[in-house]
From Swiss-Prot:
It is found in: Secreted. One of its GO terms (molecular function) is toxin activity. Disulfide bonds join C5-C55, C14-C38, C30-C51. Negative results: mambaquaretin-7 is a weak trypsin inhibitor. SMART domains: KU. This is Mambaquaretin-7. InterPro entries: Kunitz_BPTI (IPR002223), Kunitz_BPTI_sf (IPR036880), Prtase_inh_Kunz-CS (IPR020901), TFPI/VKTCI-like (IPR050098). Changing A27S: In Mambaquaretin-8. GO terms for cellular component: extracellular space. Expressed by the venom gland. The mixture of mambaquaretin-7 and mambaquaretin-8 interacts with vasopressin V2 receptor (V2R/AVPR2), probably in a selective manner. This mixture inhibits vasopressin binding human V2R in the nanomolar range (Ki=3.14 nM), and also potently inhibits vasopressin-induced cAMP production (IC(50)=58 nM). In vivo, intraperitoneal injection of this protein into rats increases diuresis, without any loss of electrolytes. Belongs to the venom Kunitz-type family. PANTHER family: BPTI_KUNITZ INHIBITOR DOMAIN-CONTAINING PROTEIN, KUNITZ-TYPE PROTEASE INHIBITOR-RELATED.
Length: 57
């Protein structure tokens, strides 16, 4: 799995509200979350399909 899949979700400190998806290693599932628009980390995907394709085993 890519490094992004090992990271915990991080929404970031900014004030935008962007729908995104993150991977939960413990559950081996992708979930929706609201990204703030800055910082965060690589565990952020535009679609649930992209998240699943990248991380779910």
């Amino acid at each position: 799995r890519p490094y992004a899949c090992e990271l915990i979700v991080a929404a970031g400190p900014c004030m935008f509200f962007i729908s995104a998806f993150y991977y939960s290693k413990g559950a081996n599932k992708c979930y929706p979350f609201t990204y703030s628009g800055c910082r965060g980390n690589a565990n952020r995907f535009k679609t649930i399909e992209e998240c699943r394709r990248t991380c779910v085993v």
